[in-house]
Amino acid sequence: TGQSKWGEKITRKDHFYKARVVEDTYDWGEYVQPSREPKDLIIYEMHVRGFTRHESSGVEHKGTFEGIREKIPYLVELGVNAVELMPIFEFDEMEDVREYEGRKLLNYWGYNPVCFFAPNTSYASALEFNREGNELRNLVRELHRNGIEVILDVVFNHTAEGNEMGPTFCFKGIDNNIYYMLTPDGQCY
């Protein structure tokens, strides 16, 4: 988790972020957030990586927040007025690697989040500290400017920390009994 290159395992000798403090100086500019009745929404559900990773997408920044931003005219042309982004939060794609027909299969979907508060680093188009946060903000701002609402698919019912034997990434360390249902003795989740 926290890897800037998709599908490359971080080794002990590699340096990676364990925590970050982000100064929020992003300029949202002037725009109005769209607000439609749910019955009027035309929703396009998409996966950040999957929507633009193929060459046929025609975007420069394939499989990233920036790649989706490049496709906004296409979404407008379709008549879409809301996008639902499948999990965009930090997760470990190397969590359960498997082989199939000689190819490495990764945790593609992101349904085992590590942190609900951090966009997935590998969805940024450039390997630059905190780029993913600004690229996500740019995407949301431009979707809104084009009249497209943003819905986030957030997974609250399980995380990459697993059960009581799993690793501690953040939720257990922040406040275990707030983030997890515990047994009456407070030991298991």
Task: Give, region by region, the residue ranges found by the protein language model.
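The feature marks proteins involved in alpha-glucan
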Residues: 1-45, 53-57
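Intrinsically disordered, low-complexity segments enriched in small/polar residues
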Residues: 24, 42, 72, 177-178
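Substrate-binding/active-site clefts of carbohydrate-active enzymes
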Residues: 12, 47-67, 73-189
